[in-house]
Amino acid sequence: MVDKLTHLKQLEAESIHIIREVAAEFDNPVMLYSIGKDSAVMLHLARKAFFPGKLPFPVMHVDTRWKFQEMYTFRDKMVEELGLDLITHVNPDGVAQGINPFTHGSAKHTDIMKTEGLKQALDKHGFDAAFGGARRDEEKSRAKERVYSFRDSKHRWDPKNQRPELWNVYNGNVNKGESIRVFPLSNWTELDIWQYIYLEGIPIVPLYFAAERDVIEKNGTLIMIDDDRILEHLSDEDKARIVKKKVRFRTLGCYPLTGAVESEAETLTDIIQEMLLTRTSERQGRVIDHDGAGSMEDKKRQGYF
């Protein structure tokens, strides 16, 4: 008699199957690493998939230069401890133009430093498949995206031109110049992610845990004062509104565009308990999701993660 797999073990097995399938099927895959909790789980699953061997593909971070300092510290620590083959890419055109989220706004900053930066990196290294940690429960445009998300030669996504995925059968045939984005965590929920992190003891960025932090409220969003660059864009009146609150982050991105939530969750069990009670989206603090109706789908059509 075969024991039934638990819910998390079923998700784990599905994700490992997808990762192995892509590694076997594509010539030059890469795993995108955004340093967040989903990336941590995806990386853990990939290491399990090929243990005791090393990952058969590199890990890539598209760096906007505006991540939280704790994220950079954590990234470098993981690369050293796990012996990862890390590629980092910063859009040189964006750097030359001095693109930043304060002067140019969230939409332009995201387009140039994230979307265009990613497309540059994929073209530069000739990757034909890129793993991403997106989940269907995060946001409506991601809810309708396939596990194998096909992109044309310009990395654009056409949601009306996706292939059916029946059972666990994935069609990876692509024409020259085309590629796919692969989402092994598609069927996971935010709660699944946290329960798996707890059970597997996966290291994550400390920003996910509640602590006293300096924040300022901007348009209803609590923005953390992560370094001095933000102070250059605050008036004296704004600086006077900086307060210390006990907050944590449910999602991590560029720090001026990522809102914190007030919380008492200092441990993984606290976070899981909080997830069982919450009724709000984890991406409520992502400023880029509020650029306009359908903004995430528009970004993805142009090549965003």
Swiss-Prot record:
SUPFAM superfamilies xrefs: Adenine nucleotide alpha hydrolases-like (SSF52402)
Keyword annotations of the record: ATP-binding, Nucleotide-binding, Nucleotidyltransferase, Transferase
Catalysed transformations (reactions): sulfate + ATP + H(+) = adenosine 5'-phosphosulfate + diphosphate
MF term (GO), any: ATP binding
EC number: 2.7.7.4
Entry-linked InterPro entries: PAPS_reduct_dom, Rossmann-like_a/b/a_fold, SO4_adenylTrfase_ssu, Sulfate_adenylyltrnsfr_sub2
GO biological process: hydrogen sulfide biosynthetic process; sulfate assimilation
Any one Pfam family match given in the protein's UniProt record, by short name: PAPS_reduct
Pathway(s) it belongs to: Sulfur metabolism; hydrogen sulfide biosynthesis; sulfite from sulfate: step 1/3
Enzyme class per UniProt: transferase
CDD domains: Sulfate_adenylyltransferase_2
Record note on quaternary structure: Heterodimer composed of CysD, the smaller subunit, and CysN.
HAMAP family listed in its UniProt record: Sulf_adenylyltr_sub2 (MF_00064)
NCBIfam families per the UniProt record, alphabetical: CysD (TIGR02039), PRK05253.1 (NF003587), PRK12563.1 (NF009214)
Entry's family note: Belongs to the PAPS reductase family. CysD subfamily.
The protein's role, per its UniProt record: With CysN forms the ATP sulfurylase (ATPS) that catalyzes the adenylation of sulfate producing adenosine 5'-phosphosulfate (APS) and diphosphate, the first enzymatic step in sulfur assimilation pathway. APS synthesis involves the formation of a high-energy phosphoric-sulfuric acid anhydride bond driven by GTP hydrolysis by CysN coupled to ATP hydrolysis by CysD.
Protein name: Sulfate adenylyltransferase subunit 2
Organism of origin: Pseudomonas fluorescens (strain SBW25)
Lineage: Bacteria, Pseudomonadati, Pseudomonadota, Gammaproteobacteria, Pseudomonadales
Name of encoding gene: cysD
